[in-house]
Amino acid sequence: MRTLWAALLVAGMAGWGARAETSLQRGKRVVDEAVAALGGQAFLNMRNRVETGRIFSSYNDKVSGMAVDALYTTYLPRPDPPEPGFLGVRVRDARGRKPEDIVLKKQDDIILYTDGAGYEVTFRGARPLSDAIVNQFKIATLHNIFYILRQRLGEPGLVIDSRGSDFFDNRPVEIVDITDTNNDTVTVYFDQMTKLPARQLYYRRDPIDNSKLEEASLFNKYRDVGGGGMWPFTIRSDRNGEKVLERYLESVEINLDLKDSMFRLAPDLKILKKEK
């Protein structure tokens, strides 16, 4: 009961203080508070990140697969001035059945997203991923709230607009729409108590039948990953209201000495036929 009253009090106080703000001013304030809660400069100056843990895929709300996962992310310098739609990240994703499969020196099945292209790399060579998969990666990245806060703030034409406050999972939240020059919008729920992102939601088109897809993500169990930088250790992804993926992280390390070659194809690697 005390927790509920505290939540109601926070929600009420946020409403009183917000009456003098425009929706744009309130949206900017909420986003600025989120950046500060994520670590401020520790978050904004994050050069790279390595997330390890377990992932569970689901179909019809039932677990359909499990793997151990090591996800490497490195950020590229932002253009000055910022460019709309700039994809400033390279990603290496290694998965396996057991922890030793994702040890760096033993990784023999990885996915690379680098310089606008994607590849599945195995002992046979590098197979370019289909245009649809690469485009889905780009869409997911540009709509990810952590990428937006790290790489897209200040982008020309980016509009941050508050939709007010509400409750989500019995906690008071601030809801903000972030819209770019392509009129693509991400709706983000920020926890009023912690100021951290709790949920995000956006829509995209199915590349096969052009139907509208709702993509939602939930973020929980934030921890300090170094220097005051915060990161969620539980991430759930839903599509059209159904759970499709859950990630349970066991460790997150930032600002490591990751070689650039980790995110590029070896010069002598055989290039296989592209996926359809």
Locate each region found by the language model.
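Bacterial N-terminal signal peptides
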Residues: W5-A14
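Bacterial Sec-dependent signal peptides at the C-terminal "C-region" and cleavage site
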Residues: A14-L24
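Gly/Pro-enriched, hydrophobic low-complexity segments
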Residues: A20, S165, D169-A266
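N-terminal mature ectodomain segment of secretory-pathway/periplasmic proteins
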Residues: T22-S23, G27-A126, V159-D161
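Short, solvent-exposed aromatic-acidic interface loops
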Residues: R92-R97, R124-G125, Y202-D206, S237-K243, ...
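Acidic/charged, solvent-exposed loop-and-adjacent secondary-structure segments enriched in E/D, K/R, S/T
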Residues: Y119-F146
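Short, conserved active-site entrance elements at the starts or edges of catalytic domains
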Residues: F137-D177, A198-L201
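Gram-negative outer-membrane assembly/targeting C-terminal domains
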Residues: R264-K276
